[in-house]
Amino acid sequence: MVRENLKVLVEYHPFHESIKKKILEEEYNFLYNPLIDGYNSNIRAYRTLGDLNTKGIKLVKEWISTLIRQHYPGFDYNIGAWIAKYNKGDYTLEHDHIPSGFSYVYFVKTPKGSSPLVFSTSGKRIKAEEGKVIIFPACMRHHVPKNRCEGRVTIAGNIWIS
């Protein structure tokens, strides 16, 4: 079965600029290359650990909850979140998010040269655009090629089905 044929949802947040401002003003504890700190991550960029719940993150999670109820009704879920900040040369290794049900990426800040999200099997590239969220089945393998700019910021997370 070609998993890339599974439903991928792409939407834009109608109030992105106000959410972006909140998220970029909030303080986060970023680590670089978490392998050095004993934490295994596919992300080779600055990233946070754990499940974030700042005001800006909560606004994004609430919007994603609305999208899930509209497009994937009939199940209970829990949404996690972390932030990744990519500078020039940073990237994310190919991976999936099994055993969660779905995963997402929300593009907070995308300067010119921001890398796309690439689904590995199909090679489909989804352009990084501010305010865009991509919700996809967790089994879909994906990666982020080397970034060509400073300051690409994303919120990503898993959507756990209960």
Where are these regions (language model features)?
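Catalytic core of non-heme Fe(II) oxygenases with the double-stranded beta-helix
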Residues: 75-146, 150-162
